[in-house]
Amino acid sequence: MIASWSVGFDEINRWTPGLLQVSIGASISEALGIQLKWPNDLIFQQQKCGGILLESSTSEERIRIGVGLNKDAREIEGVSYAGWEDYYGDINADDMFQIIDASISSILDSSPPIENSSEILWQQKSWIKLSEILSRGVITQYDEQTVNVVGLSNTGELNAISVTSKHEIQDVGDFFIAF
């Protein structure tokens, strides 16, 4: 299942893109009972089952939120992927869309009488969801150094420490998690 939402900058101007992406992942993973791997992977039993992507369009003054979620487990080029039938059972795509839509709305919807979700609340919830994987003895490396991930910044970056220094990890390019 692939779905996308288009949201105006004015509706999300209080969010940094990094924290918004991680928060959406936390909300969806919480609703589905699965894990979140920073910054945007949805994980079930150490297998990727979906992901979240944000794309901005300054000319349209909008951000598109894309969510992809596998229905069936599969293997592609020797890599196993989970599907929602593994963790949620036999549910159709329309019902799964409703769950994901509600998860995204829980963050973004501010129409009365609903108050805006606090960024600090979602930063904390995101850290809790990310910690589910990080606390299971995974190996994390950044810039070819072993690091301990110790927090999530208010912009959605990972805070990590190595033997020699502190790091703010902004990009997955030099970051690695091994289960």
Predicted feature locations:
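Catalytic beta-strand/loop module used to bind and position nucleotide/cofactor moieties
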Residues: 4-179
